[in-house]
Protein backbone atom coordinates (compact mmCIF):
# COMPACT_ATOMS: atom_id res chain seq x y z
CA UNK A 1 0.00 0.00 0.00
CA UNK A 2 3.04 2.31 0.26
CA UNK A 3 3.01 2.77 -3.52
CA UNK A 4 -0.63 3.88 -3.46
CA UNK A 5 0.12 6.37 -0.67
CA UNK A 6 3.05 7.81 -2.65
CA UNK A 7 0.96 8.15 -5.82
CA UNK A 8 -1.88 9.80 -3.89
CA UNK A 9 0.44 12.30 -2.22
CA UNK A 10 2.25 13.10 -5.46
CA UNK A 11 -1.00 13.64 -7.34
CA UNK A 12 -2.39 16.04 -4.75
CA UNK A 13 0.60 18.38 -4.84
CA UNK A 14 1.84 18.10 -8.43
CA UNK A 15 0.12 21.24 -9.73
CA UNK A 16 2.74 22.47 -12.17
CA UNK A 17 1.15 21.97 -15.59
CA UNK A 18 -0.60 24.65 -17.60
CA UNK A 19 -4.38 24.30 -17.86
CA UNK A 20 -6.63 25.31 -20.70
CA UNK A 21 -8.82 28.42 -20.47
CA UNK A 22 -12.19 26.73 -19.88
CA UNK A 23 -13.38 27.26 -16.30
CA UNK A 24 -13.15 24.25 -14.03
CA UNK A 25 -16.24 22.13 -13.28
CA UNK A 26 -16.06 19.64 -10.41
CA UNK A 27 -17.99 16.73 -8.94
CA UNK A 28 -17.07 17.75 -5.40
CA UNK A 29 -17.83 18.71 -2.73
CA UNK A 30 -21.37 17.30 -2.56
CA UNK A 31 -22.82 13.87 -3.30
CA UNK A 32 -24.50 14.87 -6.58
CA UNK A 33 -22.21 14.03 -9.49
CA UNK A 34 -22.20 16.41 -12.47
CA UNK A 35 -22.85 15.10 -16.01
CA UNK A 36 -19.85 17.15 -17.24
CA UNK A 37 -16.76 15.18 -18.29
CA UNK A 38 -13.10 16.19 -18.43
CA UNK A 39 -11.69 17.59 -21.67
CA UNK A 40 -9.77 15.06 -23.79
CA UNK A 41 -6.18 14.43 -22.62
CA UNK A 42 -6.56 16.60 -19.53
CA UNK A 43 -6.35 15.57 -15.87
CA UNK A 44 -8.43 17.00 -13.05
CA UNK A 45 -7.56 16.36 -9.40
CA UNK A 46 -10.29 16.94 -6.81
CA UNK A 47 -9.00 16.61 -3.26
CA UNK A 48 -10.39 17.37 0.16
CA UNK A 49 -10.14 16.96 3.92
CA UNK A 50 -13.23 15.91 5.85
CA UNK A 51 -14.38 15.44 9.45
CA UNK A 52 -17.47 13.49 10.47
CA UNK A 53 -18.97 12.93 13.92
CA UNK A 54 -21.61 10.34 14.79
CA UNK A 55 -22.36 10.17 18.53
CA UNK A 56 -18.90 9.60 20.07
CA UNK A 57 -17.30 8.23 16.90
CA UNK A 58 -15.13 10.53 14.78
CA UNK A 59 -13.87 9.99 11.26
CA UNK A 60 -11.25 11.96 9.33
CA UNK A 61 -10.30 11.66 5.68
CA UNK A 62 -6.91 13.32 5.21
CA UNK A 63 -7.14 13.49 2.29
CA UNK A 64 -9.72 12.07 -0.09
CA UNK A 65 -9.05 12.49 -3.78
CA UNK A 66 -10.51 11.85 -7.23
CA UNK A 67 -8.23 11.71 -10.28
CA UNK A 68 -10.19 12.25 -13.53
CA UNK A 69 -8.79 11.91 -17.06
CA UNK A 70 -10.55 12.75 -20.34
CA UNK A 71 -10.00 9.84 -22.74
CA UNK A 72 -12.07 11.27 -25.60
CA UNK A 73 -14.73 13.92 -26.23
CA UNK A 74 -17.58 12.42 -24.20
CA UNK A 75 -15.81 10.12 -21.76
CA UNK A 76 -13.51 10.13 -18.77
CA UNK A 77 -11.94 7.52 -16.54
CA UNK A 78 -11.40 8.09 -12.83
CA UNK A 79 -9.68 6.76 -9.72
CA UNK A 80 -10.89 7.58 -6.21
CA UNK A 81 -9.02 7.07 -2.96
CA UNK A 82 -8.98 8.27 0.64
CA UNK A 83 -6.76 7.95 3.70
CA UNK A 84 -9.12 7.43 6.62
CA UNK A 85 -8.66 7.79 10.39
CA UNK A 86 -11.51 6.21 12.36
CA UNK A 87 -11.79 7.02 16.10
CA UNK A 88 -14.21 4.76 17.96
CA UNK A 89 -14.84 4.43 21.70
CA UNK A 90 -11.83 2.30 22.61
CA UNK A 91 -9.93 1.85 19.37
CA UNK A 92 -8.56 3.68 16.36
CA UNK A 93 -7.98 2.50 12.79
CA UNK A 94 -6.18 4.33 10.01
CA UNK A 95 -5.23 3.55 6.44
CA UNK A 96 -6.29 3.71 2.81
CA UNK A 97 -9.87 2.74 1.98
CA UNK A 98 -10.60 0.46 -1.01
CA UNK A 99 -9.56 2.07 -4.28
CA UNK A 100 -12.47 2.96 -6.58
CA UNK A 101 -12.11 2.91 -10.37
CA UNK A 102 -14.77 4.06 -12.80
CA UNK A 103 -15.82 5.86 -15.95
CA UNK A 104 -18.29 8.57 -16.93
CA UNK A 105 -19.91 8.94 -20.35
CA UNK A 106 -21.76 12.10 -21.42
CA UNK A 107 -24.94 11.14 -23.28
CA UNK A 108 -26.76 14.37 -24.17
CA UNK A 109 -26.47 18.15 -23.88
CA UNK A 110 -29.12 20.32 -22.29
CA UNK A 111 -31.79 21.33 -24.81
CA UNK A 112 -35.20 22.68 -23.85
CA UNK A 113 -36.72 20.34 -21.27
CA UNK A 114 -34.04 17.71 -21.88
CA UNK A 115 -31.30 17.97 -19.24
CA UNK A 116 -27.59 17.34 -19.56
CA UNK A 117 -27.27 13.57 -19.16
CA UNK A 118 -24.40 11.24 -18.33
CA UNK A 119 -23.86 7.72 -17.05
CA UNK A 120 -21.38 6.96 -14.26
CA UNK A 121 -20.16 3.45 -13.44
CA UNK A 122 -17.57 2.58 -10.81
CA UNK A 123 -16.48 -0.23 -8.51
CA UNK A 124 -14.52 -0.39 -5.26
CA UNK A 125 -11.75 -2.99 -5.25
CA UNK A 126 -11.74 -4.67 -1.81
CA UNK A 127 -8.11 -5.84 -1.75
CA UNK A 128 -6.64 -2.47 -2.84
CA UNK A 129 -6.84 -1.13 0.71
CA UNK A 130 -5.01 -1.26 4.01
CA UNK A 131 -5.91 -4.23 6.22
CA UNK A 132 -8.17 -2.24 8.54
CA UNK A 133 -10.47 -1.25 5.68
CA UNK A 134 -10.43 -4.23 3.34
CA UNK A 135 -13.92 -5.41 2.38
CA UNK A 136 -15.28 -8.92 1.67
CA UNK A 137 -16.66 -8.21 -1.81
CA UNK A 138 -16.41 -5.86 -4.77
CA UNK A 139 -18.93 -3.01 -4.62
CA UNK A 140 -20.14 -1.89 -8.08
CA UNK A 141 -22.26 1.23 -8.56
CA UNK A 142 -24.08 2.78 -11.50
CA UNK A 143 -25.77 6.20 -11.67
CA UNK A 144 -27.68 8.31 -14.15
CA UNK A 145 -26.58 11.95 -13.82
CA UNK A 146 -28.79 14.85 -14.92
CA UNK A 147 -28.64 18.64 -14.75
CA UNK A 148 -31.14 21.31 -15.84
CA UNK A 149 -30.07 24.87 -16.61
CA UNK A 150 -32.64 27.08 -14.88
CA UNK A 151 -30.86 30.29 -15.89
CA UNK A 152 -27.35 31.44 -16.76
CA UNK A 153 -26.51 31.45 -13.05
CA UNK A 154 -28.66 28.62 -11.63
CA UNK A 155 -28.81 24.85 -12.12
CA UNK A 156 -30.74 21.90 -10.76
CA UNK A 157 -28.98 18.55 -10.70
CA UNK A 158 -30.00 15.07 -9.62
CA UNK A 159 -28.65 11.52 -9.61
CA UNK A 160 -30.42 8.17 -9.49
CA UNK A 161 -28.59 4.91 -9.10
CA UNK A 162 -27.86 1.67 -7.32
CA UNK A 163 -24.85 0.32 -5.44
CA UNK A 164 -24.26 -3.29 -4.39
CA UNK A 165 -22.92 -3.27 -0.83
CA UNK A 166 -19.55 -4.89 -0.16
CA UNK A 167 -20.69 -6.50 3.09
CA UNK A 168 -23.84 -8.22 1.80
CA UNK A 169 -23.96 -7.76 -2.01
CA UNK A 170 -27.49 -6.39 -1.47
CA UNK A 171 -28.54 -3.39 -3.61
CA UNK A 172 -28.68 0.06 -2.04
CA UNK A 173 -30.60 2.71 -3.99
CA UNK A 174 -29.19 6.22 -4.30
CA UNK A 175 -30.97 9.49 -4.98
CA UNK A 176 -29.67 13.06 -4.87
CA UNK A 177 -31.04 16.53 -5.56
CA UNK A 178 -28.83 19.61 -5.77
CA UNK A 179 -29.48 23.28 -6.59
CA UNK A 180 -26.75 25.84 -7.21
CA UNK A 181 -26.67 29.57 -7.83
CA UNK A 182 -23.70 31.70 -8.90
CA UNK A 183 -23.57 34.89 -6.85
CA UNK A 184 -20.66 36.20 -8.92
CA UNK A 185 -18.33 34.78 -11.57
CA UNK A 186 -16.21 33.35 -8.77
CA UNK A 187 -18.64 32.42 -5.97
CA UNK A 188 -21.33 29.75 -6.12
CA UNK A 189 -23.75 28.50 -3.44
CA UNK A 190 -25.00 24.90 -3.43
CA UNK A 191 -27.78 23.25 -1.40
CA UNK A 192 -28.35 19.51 -1.54
CA UNK A 193 -30.38 16.62 -0.17
CA UNK A 194 -29.61 12.97 -0.81
CA UNK A 195 -30.33 9.53 0.53
CA UNK A 196 -29.49 5.83 0.47
CA UNK A 197 -32.11 3.12 0.87
CA UNK A 198 -32.01 -0.66 1.14
CA UNK A 199 -35.10 -2.78 0.60
CA UNK A 200 -37.26 -3.03 3.76
CA UNK A 201 -35.18 -0.35 5.53
CA UNK A 202 -35.73 3.33 6.22
CA UNK A 203 -33.72 5.60 3.93
CA UNK A 204 -30.67 7.34 5.35
CA UNK A 205 -31.21 10.99 4.40
CA UNK A 206 -28.73 13.85 4.50
CA UNK A 207 -28.72 17.57 3.71
CA UNK A 208 -25.76 19.88 3.15
CA UNK A 209 -24.78 23.33 1.93
CA UNK A 210 -21.57 24.38 0.21
CA UNK A 211 -19.70 27.42 -1.05
CA UNK A 212 -17.45 27.15 -4.13
CA UNK A 213 -14.84 29.79 -4.91
CA UNK A 214 -12.97 29.87 -8.23
CA UNK A 215 -9.39 30.95 -7.49
CA UNK A 216 -8.36 30.70 -11.15
CA UNK A 217 -10.03 29.30 -14.25
CA UNK A 218 -8.38 25.96 -13.53
CA UNK A 219 -8.51 25.98 -9.70
CA UNK A 220 -11.43 25.88 -7.27
CA UNK A 221 -11.71 25.98 -3.47
CA UNK A 222 -14.77 24.60 -1.69
CA UNK A 223 -16.19 24.23 1.81
CA UNK A 224 -19.22 22.18 2.82
CA UNK A 225 -21.16 21.32 5.98
CA UNK A 226 -24.11 19.03 6.52
CA UNK A 227 -26.08 16.72 8.77
CA UNK A 228 -28.20 13.60 8.58
CA UNK A 229 -31.97 14.13 8.73
CA UNK A 230 -35.09 12.05 9.34
CA UNK A 231 -34.57 8.30 9.97
CA UNK A 232 -30.81 8.63 10.39
CA UNK A 233 -28.30 8.60 13.26
CA UNK A 234 -27.16 11.95 14.63
CA UNK A 235 -24.30 12.76 12.31
CA UNK A 236 -22.60 15.99 11.34
CA UNK A 237 -19.79 16.59 8.87
CA UNK A 238 -17.65 19.32 7.37
CA UNK A 239 -15.26 19.26 4.41
CA UNK A 240 -12.85 21.60 2.69
CA UNK A 241 -11.25 20.92 -0.66
CA UNK A 242 -9.18 22.09 -3.59
CA UNK A 243 -9.61 21.05 -7.22
CA UNK A 244 -7.15 21.65 -10.05
CA UNK A 245 -7.34 21.03 -13.79
CA UNK A 246 -4.12 20.23 -15.63
Report residues per predicted region.
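Cleavable N-terminal export/targeting peptides
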Residues: 1-27
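Transmembrane beta-barrel domains of Gram-negative outer membranes and organellar outer membranes
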Residues: 21-246
Amino acid sequence: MKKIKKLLTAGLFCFTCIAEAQQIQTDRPNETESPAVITTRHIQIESGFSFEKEDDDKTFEVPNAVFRYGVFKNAEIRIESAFKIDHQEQEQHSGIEPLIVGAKYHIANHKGLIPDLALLARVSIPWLADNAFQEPKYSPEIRMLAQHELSKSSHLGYNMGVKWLAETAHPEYIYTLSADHALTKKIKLVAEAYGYAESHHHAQNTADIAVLYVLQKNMQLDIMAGSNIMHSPQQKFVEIGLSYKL
